[in-house]
Amino acid sequence: MNRINQLFSTKQKDILSIYFCAGFPTLEGTASTIKVLEKKGINMIEIGIPFSDPMADGPVIQHAATRALKNGMTLKLLFDQLKDIRKEVQIPLVLMGYLNPIMQYGFKDFCRTCRETGIDGVIIPDLPFKDYMEEYRSIAEEQDVRIIMLITPETSEERIRLIDEHTDGFIYMVSSAAITGAQKDFNAQKQAYFQRIADMNLRNPRMIGFGISNKQTFETASAHAAGAIIGSKFVTLLDEEDGDTEKAADKLLEALKN
């Protein structure tokens, strides 16, 4: 069974997924960051593939991507860094990146290397659902790689039902149609959106991302979905701690408790 499906079959609530950008703040820290996060009890990890034009990302993750590219991070190097990761790490690993670098690598080769490396899923924010259905789905399924689709408050019920029917793993609920970044709490409008999706009784579990940074936002996300994805907050802490994942993770976990 794919590790993503395994996770959601054994844990239905309070799942914590952490995002970081490969190659930030240092080029060589990718594997060690993953190992530390697993040790700290994180349930799933999203590894960002840096790209020069990350349209869905806020200033924090844009800055991380720019620095990672300057450091020399590439998709090929990322796969090289992860080639032995499954000797030590058991939790699901998901790559998050834009279509451009993935297509330069070659989508078939990309999915095959994901399987060989032990990557369980891929989030591609700028992959149109129609293209996924017509071209990419069968290639990914052949390699047992889950393609995770995003929905926003503006996504129609019809589209959400289609995504739920034709994907497997989890649905990434973007808390707002804006770019990523921390929020102190979720307003009534956002909570109504979370509840509306929960009431649809979808087949796939849902994870809420964009704006999770403290106990309040994490608990709200967990009340309406299987858990939360935290990116900008952790990337900021990694930067502040000069790449010390141990300290950054401790500070994040502390923020989620108080």
UniProtKB/Swiss-Prot annotation:
Q: Which reaction does it catalyse?
A: (1S,2R)-1-C-(indol-3-yl)glycerol 3-phosphate + L-serine = D-glyceraldehyde 3-phosphate + L-tryptophan + H2O
Q: What CDD domains does the entry give?
A: Tryptophan_synthase_alpha
Active-site annotation: 46, 57
EC assignment: 4.2.1.20
PROSITE patterns per UniProt: TRP_SYNTHASE_ALPHA
Which pathway does UniProt place it in?
A: Amino-acid biosynthesis; L-tryptophan biosynthesis; L-tryptophan from chorismate: step 5/5
Q: Show the GO cellular component annotation of the record.
A: cytosol
Q: Which InterPro entries match?
A: Aldolase_TIM, RibuloseP-bd_barrel, Trp_synthase_alpha_AS, Trp_synthase_suA
Question: How does this polypeptide assemble, per the annotation?
Answer: Tetramer of two alpha and two beta chains.
By sequence similarity, the record places it as follows: Belongs to the TrpA family.
What is the protein name stated in its UniProt record?
Answer: Tryptophan synthase alpha chain
- Could you tell me which species this protein originates from? Phocaeicola vulgatus (strain ATCC 8482 / DSM 1447 / JCM 5826 / CCUG 4940 / NBRC 14291 / NCTC 11154)
